[in-house]
Each structure stands twice: as C-alpha cells, then as structure tokens.
Amino acid sequence: MIDHSQKRYAVIGGDGMLGHAMVRFFRKNKKEVIGTSRRSNSDERAVFLDFAKEDSWGNILNCTDAIIVGGITDYWECKNNPDAVFINEQCIPKLALFLSKHNIRVSFISSNTVFSGSKPWPKENAPHSPVLDYGQQKSNAEQNILQMTYEAGTKDLIKIIRPTKILTMDTSPLPDWIKAWSKAQKVDTFKDLIVAPITLGYVVKCLSTIVESKESGCYHLSGSENIDYFNLGKLLAKALGYSSSLVNKTTSIEAGVAIPFLPKYSGLGMIGTTKMFGIESQKIQEVVKELCK
C-alpha cells in the first residue's frame, strides 16, 4: 500500500512542453517529483516509461500521484497514424487503471477538443461532441479510464483535467509574427481561428493545485474569453510596442491554409472548478502580460 503521507509525483510525459514545466514547478517548490520519458537521450533524471510497454509501468510505483501528460497529441498524426488510437485510447487507460489499482491517484490531462466548439462555455459535466480525431481519442480515453476504474472500484482516485490552448512565445505562429514585426513587416492573421488561450505558468500553477488535492472529478482550465488570432495579434503587437497596422486580417480559407479544427467557441466553463478550488479563468490581459515578460 502506498504511503500518502509523503507525496511523490510522477509526471508521465515529462519531456514534453507541459510535462517539463510541471516537473520544474514541483522541483522549484521542493516537491519530490520524477518525470518519465520513453527516449534514451532525455534528462538523465528521467525514469523510463513507454505507454506501449507494460513492463515499464512498474518503474513509477513508488509515487503517490501520477499526472498523465503524454500521448500522441499532434492533430494530423492522430488522424493518420493507426498507433494513435492504440496509445491514446487503449494504453493510457490501461496505465491509469494499473496505477489506481496500486492506490496511486491519477490525473489525466485531456483537452477542450472533446467538445465540438459549437456551443459556448461547456460545463465540466457537459456531454462530449468531438469532431476531431484527436478530440475523439481524448474523449474515448476519458470514458475508458472512468469505466475501467469504476469497475475496479478505484474511480475515486481519478481526475480528468481539460485545458484550452496553452500559449508560449514559442507557440506557432507567434515567433514568425514577432520576427516580422521587428522588421516592420505585416503578418496575416486568421479571423476564423478562435482560441481561449492560457499561459504555461497559469496552467502549471492550477494543475498543481488540482493534482495535490484528494478531490476526484473532472475540471476545466480556460481563458476567460474566446478571441480570434486577428485580435490576439493586435493585442500582442501593442504589448510589444509594435503598431497594430502590422496585423492584417484574413481567414485560413482565404490564405489557403488547412486547419483541422476551427471551433466557433474554444473556451470552457469553469463553474465546478472554481467552486471546488477557487481557480478563475485567465483573463486575456493576463495572458498577454505573461507572454511579454
């Protein structure tokens, strides 16, 4: 039986953007944490774990809490790679079940793409309506995890957490925008691409609050408003000291760019999450301010 009096965190997928940030946050706050990787050339402190290799799962049985961040997340790969369904819908739920049977609390990082984006601010318990392969795989993973752990009597150890779009200054197309603006060149931005962005700092801090609690359930982390890339570009340009005249408005269709997911609404309702943890959605002004630090 795991001793929960001394928390030990395992970030599964600790070499990805979010996973790496989670590991750094826990270490900075003097928490005992390990990150996992299936790559041999990763951080020397990383523990080997491969979703498809069940004999590697026992490598983290000394943890009390596991955060499943990894998986196949690229939209196009989820659509075209047959392994995506196997990893995302079968292996990850089986891993969550395995860990829960060893009395380890499991937080599964899902996505706002379990919803179609046709309705604003879906609540934590709203019915799923995915239109994207990636969203369908996340939806199926959620349902498989909950069903399998319910049958095993370990569902009370499971948390599902859905963030909206996480932005950093390295998130495409922001680096290209900034490079162009620095040369006084205009950029084309898409009016039909809607996001409810949150920053890496916000999501990591909020995730740590949720993960460290004993509360099971489904929770949302979202930006406070739906904003298109044209208006996001104008806000960002202004914050960086560039003229908003350098931000052109177009659409992905007009630009001939194939974007797999164009939701009308991207934001998530956070009523249940706010009530449970006091976590509020992140205002767009805070997003831009943090990005421009």
Question: Which residue stretches match the model-derived regions?
Answer:
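Conserved Rossmann-fold NAD(P)-dependent oxidoreductase catalytic core, especially the SDR/UDP-sugar
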Residues: 94-131
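NAD(P)H-binding glycine-rich loop region in Rossmannoid oxidoreductase-like domains
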Residues: 48-89
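C-terminal amphipathic/interface module of NAD(P)-dependent oxidoreductases
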Residues: 246, 261-293
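N-terminal Rossmann NAD(P)H-binding glycine-rich loop of SDR-like oxidoreductase domains
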Residues: 2, 7-29
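Glycine-rich Rossmann NAD(P)(H)-binding loop
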Residues: 189-194, 219-226, 276
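Mid/C-terminal beta-alpha module of Rossmann-like enzyme folds, strongest
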Residues: 206, 213-259, 265, 292
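NAD(P)-dependent short-chain dehydrogenase/reductase
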Residues: 143-195, 201-202
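Glycine-rich NAD(P)-binding loop of the Rossmann-fold in SDR/ketoreductase-type enzymes
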Residues: 83-94, 128, 132, 136-139
